[in-house]
Structure formats: C-alpha cells, structure tokens
Amino acid sequence: VAIGDAYVTGEDLAVRLNKPNDGFFDDIVSAASRAVELFTGRQFNRTETAAARRFRAVDWYRLPVDDFWTTTGLVISVDGTAWLVTDVDPRPWDGIYNGQPGWPFFDLFTVDRVWPYTTRGRRALITVTAKWGWTAVPEPIKQATLDVAQDIQAGISVDVTTEQVGGVAVTARSLRTESMDLAGLVSGNPAAFLRAIPYVRDSPMGIA
C-alpha cells in the first residue's frame, strides 16, 4: 500500500456496514485512515524507493527515526560524511516490539561510535535515507480504520452543488471533512482506541 493510500477500501466498509457503497465510501475510509495516522503519529503504508529525511539524536547513542521497513537502501550521513551500515544497530530486532511481530525499525543505535549530540544549543541534523513505512498494514489498524469510518458514515455531511455546463445542469456531491476532529474520532471510539493505542509513538525528531 503506497504512502497516502487508505488502509482499507470502500468495499471493506460496505461489507462492515452490510450496505452498498454509496459513492462516498472511498472518501470516508481515506479520512478515517488520516484520523488513525494523526492519533498514532505513524504512517502505516510504505515507500518502495528510499528517500532522505533528517533527524536529531536524543542522546549519544540513540537516534529515533520515522518507521522504515527494510535495511535495504539504508544510508546514514552525519555532517555530510557517510557512515557504514555496520556503524548502526537498527531496532527493534527481528521486527518484534512488546512481544508482537511485524514491526518496522524506528530506532538507530550506534555501534562503537556516537551521534553528534549536545545539551547546549542546537543538535546537528543527521540524514537518514531509507524505505519508509511498514511492510504491511497491521490488522488492528485496518479494523480501527473501519471503526472510525463507520462513525464518519453515521454522521456524514455532504455538500451538493449544481452548475450549468454547456447548458446542462451538473450536480456534484462532496464529502465535508474539514470540520471533523479526525484524531478525536479515534479516541472517541472505544473499539478504535483500544486497537490503535498500542501503535501510538512519541514523535521522532524528523524533518521530512
């Protein structure tokens, strides 16, 4: 699933609701996916091409980064100098975190080196090039997305506009989402909250 895609489909929501897709289900699951991202502070899709992002170390040995799903293509540059991949220890090991498999890497620990770090002034930016995201969207995240989508669908607000195009009246309908508290949709839904809370993280020091 590419970055920016919904974690479930409109047809998945149709099955959950046991009703046909009314034409807005794809928009609803997209909004629900963004709600889950805001609540967890994570992006569960993945990129297939490595891209550079910048981060700051939190101490001499640990660099929290955005989630990345493979060490293939991993490059670390400090002050313009490339480090060897063996200079860092990506964690969690074996994709296991809190006893659960399937996790990406999100911490880089140094091996016989230290990150540029100071408690005085601004810390140096460290450039990490990686394939960001998760190998696969976790099932609890898919279900949390459907929980939120179900709530959105129940309280849906639709704008209807009509305009003349070449002498023909054309009516358009659009889903109104700008007034929604997206992150609040997760915390306000007990099922979604319980499914998503294990994936909440502190924000890394990244600059996309």
Language-model regions: role of each:
Residues 1-208:
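Divalent metal-cofactor coordination and adjacent catalytic microenvironments
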